[in-house]
Amino acid sequence: MAAAMGLERKAKVAEVALRCAVCALAALAAALVGTGSQTRTFFSLEKKARFTDMKALVLLVAAHGAAAVYSLLQLARCAAAAAWKGGSNGGAAVVAWSVFSCDQAVAYALMAATAAALQSSVVGKRGQPELQWMPVCGLYGAFCRRVGEGLAAAVAAGLAAVLLAAVSAFNLFRLYGGGGGGRKSSAGAVSGNGANTW
C-alpha cells in the first residue's frame, strides 16, 4: 500500500512537471515562430517573410498557443485538486477520462502540427528542384533560423505532451486496477485510500 501511494505521488509530480514543460515549450515555440520576420529589398521592392506566408507555420503557432493555454488551465486544476483534498471521490473517473482524452488530443495535435511545419520548412530550406521551387532560406536566413529555433521548441513540447499523455493514461487506468485494495464505486472505478484524480 505504501508503494502504491509512493508511485501515485511520483505520477502526480511527473504530471505537474510535464504540464509546466509543455506550457513553457509550447508558448516558446509559438512566440518564436509567431514573432519572427525578416524584410528584404528586391529591386526597390520590399518583401517581408512572416509565419503567415506558410500555412503549416500558422497551424504550428495556433496549435502550440492553444496547448500552452490548455496546459496552464490544467496546472490550475492540479493546484485546485491538491488544495482541496477532502470530499467525495465519485467524479474521479469522469475527470480522469476527460483529462486523458484532452491530453491525447493535445499530444496528437502538437505532433501533427510540428510534423507539418518540419516538412514545409525542409522545402523552404532545400527547395524542390523538380518543381522549380527555389530554397528561400538563403534569402531570409534570420527568419529561417528563428523558425528553426521555434521548431526545436515545438519538437520538445510535442515529446513532453506524449509523455504527459502516458502519465494521464496511468492516472486513468490505475482507477480500474485491482492491486490497490480499493473498493469499486458505482461508476466502476476503484476509489481507494481517498485518492483524488487531478
Swiss-Prot record:
Cytoplasmic face of the membrane: 1-12, 77-91, 171-198
Transport recorded as keyword: no
GO cellular component terms listed in the entry, alphabetical order: plasma membrane
Keyword Membrane: yes
InterPro entries listed in its UniProt record: CASP/CASPL, CASP_dom
Transmembrane segments: 13-33, 56-76, 92-112, 150-170
Keywords for this protein: Cell membrane, Membrane, Transmembrane, Transmembrane helix
Residue ranges annotated as Extracellular topological domain: 34-55, 113-149
Subcellular location: Cell membrane
Membrane-related topology note: Multi-pass membrane protein
Family: Belongs to the Casparian strip membrane proteins (CASP) family.
Known partners and oligomeric status: Homodimer and heterodimers.
NCBIfam families: A_tha_TIGR01569
Name of this protein: CASP-like protein 2B1
Native species: Oryza sativa subsp. japonica (Rice)
